[in-house]
From Swiss-Prot:
Keyword Cytoplasm: yes
Organism lineage string: Eukaryota, Metazoa, Chordata, Craniata, Vertebrata
Membrane topology summary: Single-pass membrane protein
Organism of derivation: Gallus gallus (Chicken)
Annotated stretches, region: Disordered: 1-82
Protein's name according to its UniProt entry: Protein FAM234B
PANTHER family in the record: PROTEIN FAM234B, PTHR21419
Record's signal peptide: none
A GO cellular-component term linked to this record: Golgi apparatus
Length: 623
């Protein structure tokens, strides 16, 4: 009864405003009630750490009860500690370990990443840099010079093209000291000129081809060697070991007439195949043989044709039209075409053929009806060179035909002439490059003019008109010009000529010795058409040259093969040399002002600054 009366009249543990003193009985009762009340409030979430949730609205009674709880806690604080401090300790939450864990994980990740970077830096070697701007390699005594054009291919996987050269080496025999000829293929490092491997072949060769060939693994380069009689073999470019050799029984009644051509995969094994053109003992009978690129086995029998024509062997070349039709171009002083579908059906002696051979080119097929045969006449009379030229902004290629009298560009779709240029005595195959600013491939060609001189001409690929020409002295055998494309889609052109007479200005201080009878390598850039850059010279006879690209350093290098022999039949010592183009331009290049120029002369510093910014890249349309 006293407890009920106390609760009704006053708050527990506080002075009654009416009585002015504490009631002991009521105080004891209220202590027990307060404990129950505090437990109930905490269980229901009313108070947490001595505070109410801010989002909940409390009525006055609950405020009173919270106040009672705070007072009760203060009264039971341990001795030696202030009641206020004890309350604050209860209100503080225990510190969380998550921030420490996150910091530890972050630091551990950083440490592991740094360790991995350091390990990779020491274990993974950096690509080797080409520090050899020049080198010279003596091949020894050879007879007949170089047997086939130089081929550049990365043989040792260092990212720099290496040089494959075929020549007839004179080996010293043990009897009477007589030298015997031996056809040799040598792979030289493009980095320093060292010999990577060397093998002997059973016969002379027409070509060594390494581009566009693969046995499924891009990391394993391969090369196709075509002989002058019956030898056709696929070699590993890394070691020189033979992968397969065509059985000569397939050429029993003929010999190889030209380098082999690479086809799309026609037998369905995933590897590109090969077609060869063979010539019988009695021309004009020729025949084609399809060869598996994977095994070297013949894909069926020989396909024979009777052709009419006299002159230089043309092709075989593979031409794919805009519709996807595949034709083989070939000829003897002329250009003819035959559908690969026809060769395949006759070789396999069946009417079915792969889906890729179903396409036809209507405009080409119209020309078939003229002679009522499988042969399609493209061009007749005096053909020396045939090249396929990628047409800009299309998937079609045009045909560039070179004769003794000029150039003819045929449209690849309908074989109609696009333009014709008359120029006499063209002595070398035109080289492709970008001279004009219309992004159309232009052509540099060389023509003999008599009196120990030659004319070098650049022809605009769109109009067929000459856009640059110069007459220079040249007494020796004609060599093909070369071109290298730059990053801004221009091309520099390289060609050999004898000493030009205009005044020379060196790009590098200091004199360069000159001797009479030197052959000079000149560079022409379309930005400076009135200036030739004389890069280097040679006293021996230059018999072959090529250019390679260093993709890593955006640089290029020129390869020259010279011989001491004064005639083709006389043996002489062969030498291969390398010249870095950027290094040559900046250190020993000399400016040659053309005589007929009317434009103001350019300062040496301006040319030097421009050349220093040049970056060379691989030619995208090079076959």
């Amino acid at each position: 009864m006293a407890t009920v009366l106390s609760r009704a009249l006053k708050l527990p543990g506080k002075k009654s405003p009416d009585l002015g003193e504490y009631d002991p009985l009521t105080q004891a009762d209220s202590d027990e009630s307060e404990d129950d009340l505090v437990l109930n409030i905490q269980k229901n979430g009313g108070v947490k750490n001595g505070k109410s949730p801010p989002e909940e609205m409390q009525d006055p009674d609950s405020d009173v009860e919270v106040g009672m709880t705070k007072q009760h806690t203060s009264e039971r604080a341990p001795e030696g500690y202030p009641a206020e401090a004890a309350g604050s300790l209860e209100q503080k939450a225990a510190p969380s370990l998550m921030p420490y864990l996150r910091t530890a994980v972050f630091l551990l990740t950083v440490v592991i990443s740094m360790i991995l970077v350091l390990v990779c830096a020491f274990l993974i070697p950096c690509p080797p840099r080409d520090l050899h701007n020049t080198w010279n390699h003596n091949l020894g005594q050879g007879a007949g010079g170089v047997l086939s054009p130089l081929e550049l291919c990365d043989v040792n996987g260092d990212g720099l093209p290496d040089i494959l050269i075929v020549f007839t080496a004179l080996m010293n025999a043990s009897v009477m000291g007589v030298s015997t000829p031996s056809v040799t293929v040598v792979a030289l490092s493009g980095m320093n000129g060292s010999t990577l491997w060397s093998i002997q072949l059973p016969e002379e060769t027409r070509s060594v081809q390494c581009k566009g060939l693969s046995l499924g693994s891009p990391a394993e380069p391969i090369c196709l060697v075509t002989g002058t009689a019956k030898f056709l073999s696929l070699l590993s470019a890394s070691t020189g070991k033979t992968i397969w050799t065509l059985n000569s029984i397939h050429l029993s009644d003929g010999i190889l007439a030209a380098p082999a051509a690479t086809l799309p995969d026609v037998d369905g094994d995933g590897i590109r195949d090969i077609v060869v053109l063979a010539l019988k003992e009695t021309q004009p009978d020729v025949f084609f043989v399809l060869v598996s690129g994977k095994t070297g086995a013949a894909l069926g029998g020989p396909v024979k044709y009777n052709v009419i024509g006299e002159g230089k062997v043309i092709g075989p070349q593979v031409h794919i039209t805009s519709r996807g039709a595949i034709y083989i171009l070939f000829g003897f002083g002329n250009v003819q075409a035959i559908a690969l579908r026809d060769i395949f059906t006759q070789a396999r002696n069946r009417d079915s053929f792969p889906m890729m051979l179903h396409q036809e080119e209507p405009e080409w097929e119209k020309r078939r009806s003229v002679n009522l045969s499988e042969l399609i006449d493209i061009y007749s009379g005096g053909v020396d060179f045939l090249q396929t030229i990628k047409a800009p902004d299309t998937n079609c290629s045009n045909l560039l035909i070179t004769t003794k009298e000029g150039l003819i560009l045929l449209q690849g779709q309908d074989l109609e002439p696009r333009w014709t240029l008359e120029i006499q005595n063209i002595s070398s195959q035109p080289v492709l490059g970008y001279f004009s600013a219309d992004q159309t491939l232009d052509f540099m060609l060389q023509a003999q003019t008599g009196n120990g001189k030659k004319k070098v001409v650049v022809v605009d690929g769109k109009s067929g008109l000459p856009v640059w020409k110069q007459e220079l002295p040249w007494q020796k055998q004609q060599l093909d010009a070369l071109s290298v494309m730059t990053l801004d889609k221009k091309s520099v052109f390289l060609f050999w000529a004898d000493e030009a007479q205009p005044v020379l200005h060196s790009l590098h201080p200091g004199p360069r010795s000159e001797r009479p009878g030197l052959h000079h390598l000149y560079l022409l850039h379309p930005v400076f058409p009135t200036v030739l850059l004389d890069l280097t010279n040679a006293t021996d006879k230059v018999i072959a040259s090529a250019v390679g690209i260093n993709d890593l350093q955006k640089d290029a290098f020129h390869i020259t093969v010279t011989t001491t022999a004064t005639s083709e039949k006389q043996p002489g010592f062969l030498s291969v040399s390398k010249l870095g183009l950027k290094w040559a331009m900046m250190t020993q290049g000399r400016m040659v002002w053309l005589k007929d120029t009317t434009t103001p002369k350019i300062s040496r510093g301006e040319v030097r600054r421009f050349l220093a910014r040049l970056k060379f890249v691989d030619f995208p349309h090079k076959l």
